[in-house]
UniProtKB/Swiss-Prot annotation:
It catalyses: Transfers a segment of a (1->4)-alpha-D-glucan chain to a primary hydroxy group in a similar glucan chain. The gene is glgB. Transmembrane segments: none annotated. PANTHER family: 1,4-ALPHA-GLUCAN-BRANCHING ENZYME. Monomer. The keyword Glycosyltransferase applies. Keywords: Carbohydrate metabolism, Glycogen biosynthesis, Glycogen metabolism, Glycosyltransferase, Transferase. This is 1,4-alpha-glucan branching enzyme GlgB. GO terms for biological process: glycogen biosynthetic process. InterPro entries: A-amylase/branching_C (IPR006048), Branching_enzy (IPR037439), GlgB (IPR006407), GlgB_N (IPR054169), GlgB_N_E_set_prok (IPR044143), Glyco_hydro_13_cat_dom (IPR006047), Glyco_hydro_13_N (IPR004193), Glyco_hydro_b (IPR013780). It is an enzyme of class 2 (transferase).
Length: 807
């Protein structure tokens, strides 16, 4: 029995219940001199060595057969640097004593973490390579204020929670321990004795690397180096720049052909980046990459927020992918999920025996739609954990933005809940005031620490001010997904063209609220799963009409105000729904399998993107009403839409869409600027497998009034197609219109009548003008059937009777 340590105290160590190991273990002053005490289960002998001379100073006595050793070092009365020589059977090992090191967290960090205002808690908490007293090792820190004991366990200590209990900082609730000679890649977890005396084995919330499911341990990894934001990347995120986003799920974009297994980050980068560059996309948006246990969640139920998923390799590999994208001039956005987390036992749930990260009341803390838990945004440490995570991804991996998932579920307490299933806020309202404040805080943190980083909200309600600055009462996002536009327009496109005239407003209503927020038009992964069909599958008609409808829709979308987002596979009109367990159907791009149809859509999207990037009217004034004007908004009978886009320099592009399978010949509409227009895009062109009803010659305005405009043009609008006309040359407008000559003649006739030189007819001047300007209907034109031979199939577009437009 040791004179200075009771048996009951020793028992608490072996029972895993001692809360203050540094008060007992290590070096201590006693009346007999300096005593060294160590806990080394299974050790047979332990000697104390002088670190300076390497001489043996004393052998420690085995105070307890289970492995508690203690002994007074002769002739010493002050602390000194020492090592331990430990004999495990016949094998001797010289080690550092973890309990010989002083606390490493400084007072400022401890105070900021306690307050929940540390900008970068990931630099303090978690596992960090460092040196203490010139000894290299890893410093482990964990926030678990209600735990009775916390130990770090891993393959370096046989996962034995008795061996390395940690030091507790009462003021912040943080546990800390420095372990020498622990190396990169080693596995670890934290073993907690919770407030109910239950053992919990938890992954590190701040781990920089994690095991691949079904394993759940954290891995010791280095904190990635900072990647600075560049002016080029910053500019590419601005609202007056072209932003066309390619949304990607890395696990199913492409897979290994031999075993259907994932490609790693480097393999993906080798293929994905050149493809995106060639296709003309400006940004890549990656579905969530924080480590997650369930493949079927697609990453939207993460546990390791600071760990890039090991499915595709290491954090360094992911960083190389981002760097390769930047070298190609492509910005990278990451889907980020701060709204909820899964209830897997190794994660955040009941972390220290209490509802530490979540709400205790299920009415606030449980998400019934997804069977997940909701973060407690009212707790400063939780807000700090989440907000700094967004900064971590931007700063340490050089990402250019985040897209925040499911914002509506965060900001409304009654989201997807019936009456009685939710708790009002302090004012009796339904808004989650703490979540709203958290979002503002996160956007402010990103904006001040990395100016130029873009934040995007997936917000599906009409919550006001999502993209307005907080000082105006907004949330501070830069862009918001326009879910209303997406739902309305897809609903319209699903309908048979014969019924579209009754739903005309679905394509125009978006302009009512277009300038209330900064919008992105999203055709995301959510629209091609869970029985919703692929985008191609949503389109009505036979094969020819399906592809024509989709091309026309894309053209309308790329011409409409708002940045663009397209989920992978939609750029070549994949026919089946997205399956996260398989690669995209790239074989459809082969002539044999796809008959050229899918390749044509791919070519079309590529051309759309490049035209979009090169023409400022299509993007520069997306958030300014001066950049848009309807030219034909009410032609519901023909399902025709015409609008004009403008740039800051007053360049003009006119977008014309015809959503019926009827060729609109000599369709006349008014324009603002007289001059020559050139057709720069036609979704019905032959190279896109259309019927090739194009306007190849210059289109010159005429002095004919139409749609309340003095100048107008007349073109053929192809069936189920979108056409872009670009103002090529401005001309001076003649003072008199063609109808004015008729009016002139009629007036002269009236004067002759007055002088008796001719006889008045019953026709008035107005009658004369009306007759002269009347357009006689032409004969019905029949558009021949378009036939495209495909291997083993024949795709036929039905012959359609087309009436001439007389507007």
């Amino acid at each position: 029995m040791n004179k200075f340590v009771s048996q009951s105290t020793i028992d608490t160590f072996f029972d895993g219940k001692h809360a203050d190991p540094f008060s007992v273990l290590g070096m201590h002053e006693t009346s007999n001199g300096i005593e060294v005490r160590v806990l080394l289960p299974d050790a047979e002998k332990v000697f104390v060595l002088s670190k300076e001379t390497k001489n043996v100073l004393c052998e420690l006595s085995r105070v307890d057969e289970r492995g508690f050793f203690a002994g007074v070092v002769p002739n010493t009365h002050s602390f000194f640097a020492y090592q331990l020589e430990v004999y495990w059977g016949n094998e001797a090992q010289v080690i550092e004593d973890p309990y010989a090191f002083h606390p490493m967290i400084n007072e400022l960090d401890n105070w900021l973490l306690a307050e929940g205002s540390h900008k970068r808690p990931y630099e303090i908490l978690g596992a960090h390579f460092t040196e203490c007293d010139n000894v290299a090792g890893v410093n482990f820190r964990l926030w678990a204020p209600n735990a009775k004991r916390v130990s770090v366990v891993g393959d370096f200590n046989y996962w034995d929670g008795r061996r390395h209990p940690m030091r507790f900082h009462q003021s912040s609730g943080i546990w800390e321990l420095f372990l020498p000679k622990v190396s990169l890649g080693q596995l670890y977890k934290f073993e907690l004795l919770d407030c109910h005396n239950q053992l919990r084995l938890k992954a590190d919330p701040y781990a920089f690397s994690s095991q691949l499911r079904p394993d759940t341990a954290s891995q010791i990894g280095a904190l990635p180096e900072i990647v600075s934001m560049t002016e080029k990347r910053r500019k590419a995120n601005q609202a007056d720049q072209p932003i066309s986003i390619y949304e990607v799920h890395l696990g199913s974009w492409r897979r290994n052909l031999e075993n259907n297994f994932w490609l790693d980050y480097d393999q993906i980068a080798e293929e994905l980046i050149p493809y995106v560059k060639d296709m003309g996309f400006t940004h890549i948006e990656l579905l969530p990459l924080s480590e997650f246990p369930f493949d079927g969640s697609w990453g939207y139920q993460p546990i390791g927020l600071y760990s890039p998923t090991s499915r595709f390799g290491t954090a360094e590999g992911f960083k190389r992918l981002v760097n390769k994208a930047h070298k190609a001039g492509i910005n990278v956005i990451l889907d980020w999920v701060p709204g909820h987390f899964p209830s897997d036992t190794h994660g955040l749930v009941a972390f220290d025996g209490t509802a530490l990260y979540e709400h205790a009341d299920p009415k606030e803390g449980y998400h019934q739609d997804w069977n997940t838990l909701i973060y407690n945004y009212g707790r400063h440490e939780v807000k700090n954990y989440l907000a700094s995570n967004a900064l971590y991804w931007m700063e340490r991996f050089g990402l250019d933005g985040i897209r925040v998932d499911a914002v509506a579920s965060m900001i409304y307490r009654d989201y997807s809940r019936e009456d009685g299933q939710w708790i009002p806020n302090q004012y009796g309202g339904r808004e989650n005031l703490e979540a709203i404040e958290f979002l503002k805080q996160t956007n402010h943190l990103l904006g001040t620490e990395i100016p130029g980083v873009v934040s995007i909200a997936e917000e599906s309600t009409s919550f006001a001010g999502v993209t307005h600055p907080p000082y105006e009462g907004g949330l501070g996002f830069h862009f918001k997904w326009n879910m209303g536009w997406m739902n309305d327009t897809l609903s319209y496109m699903k309908k048979d063209p014969i019924y579209r005239q009754h739903h005309h407003s679905q394509m125009t209503f978006g302009m009512v609220y277009q300038y209330s927020e900064n919008f992105i038009l999203p055709l995301s992964h959510d629209e091609v799963v869970h029985g919703k069909c692929s985008l191609l599958g949503k389109m009505p008609g036979d094969a020819w009409q399906k592809f024509a409808n989709l091309r026309a829709y894309y053209g309308y979308m790329w011409g409409y105000p708002g940045k663009k987002l397209l989920f992978m596979g939609n750029e070549f009109a994949q026919g089946r729904e997205w399956n996260y367990q398989e690669s995209l159907d790239w074989y459809l791009l082969d002539e044999f399998h796809g008959g050229g149809w899918h390749k044509a859509v791919q070519d079309y999207v590529r051309d759309l993107n490049h035209i979009y990037q090169k023409n400022a009217p299509l993007f520069e004034l997306d958030t300014d009403p001066q950049g848009f004007e309807w030219l034909v908004v009410d032609d519901y009978q023909n399902s025709v839409f015409v609008f004009e886009r403008r740039s800051k320099k007053d360049e003009r592009i006119i977008v014309i869409s015809n959503f019926t399978p009827v060729l609109r010949q000599n369709y006349r509409f008014g324009v603002n600027i007289a001059g020559e227009y050139m057709e720069i895009l036609n979704s019905d062109a032959q190279q896109y497998m259309g019927s090739n009803s194009t306007n190849t010659s210059k289109i010159v305005t005429e002095d004919i009034e139409s749609h309340n405009k003095a100048q107008s043009i007349s073109i053929d609008i192809p069936p189920l197609a979108t056409v872009y006309l670009k103002l090529h040359k401005v001309k001076k407008v003649r003072k008199m219109r063609k109808t004015s000559k008729v009016e002139d003649t009629a007036v002269k006739t009236e004067k002759k009548i007055a002088k008796g030189k001719t006889t008045r007819t019953k026709k008035t001047v107005a009658d004369t003008v009306s007759e002269a300007t009347e357009v006689k209907p032409k004969k019905t034109v029949t558009k021949r059937a378009v036939v495209k031979k495909v291997k083993n199939a024949e795709v036929i577009a039905e012959s359609t009777s087309v009436e001439n437009n007389v507007s």
